Amino acid sequence: MEVTDVRLRRVNTEGRMRAIASITLDQEFVVHDIRVIDGNNGLFVAMPSKRTPDGEFRDIAHPINSGTRSKIQEAVLAEYQKAGEDEVNYEEAGAS
């Protein structure tokens, strides 16, 4: 399984969420609402989740092994870093 596309939208919030991403797996399956979170130990990826009636959050979709989780996290965070660099380059070019 490969992450074949990452679409990312940065968000400006007061909280720790920095972006929302959608990923395409093997050009056949899309997972939306993956969040990039600024945690105590740096950025990490949180899978899409839903609040249950008792207030807990349950993942809607998630990898079942650490290798797949790493692939997804690396792809999403690489796109997040790239989007940040593109934003800086755009601002340096005089656009605002």
Curated annotation (Swiss-Prot):
<dbReference type="Pfam" id="PF04026">
    <property type="entry name" value="SpoVG"/>
</dbReference>
<keyword id="KW-0717">Septation</keyword>
<comment type="similarity">
    <text>Belongs to the SpoVG family.</text>
</comment>
<dbReference type="GO" id="GO:0030435">
    <property type="term" value="P:sporulation resulting in formation of a cellular spore"/>
</dbReference>
<dbReference type="GO" id="GO:0000917">
    <property type="term" value="P:division septum assembly"/>
</dbReference>
<comment type="function">
    <text>Could be involved in septation.</text>
</comment>
<keyword id="KW-0131">Cell cycle</keyword>
<dbReference type="InterPro" id="IPR007170">
    <property type="entry name" value="SpoVG"/>
</dbReference>
<keyword id="KW-0132">Cell division</keyword>
<protein>
    <recommendedName>
        <fullName>Putative septation protein SpoVG</fullName>
    </recommendedName>
</protein>
<dbReference type="InterPro" id="IPR036751">
    <property type="entry name" value="SpoVG_sf"/>
</dbReference>
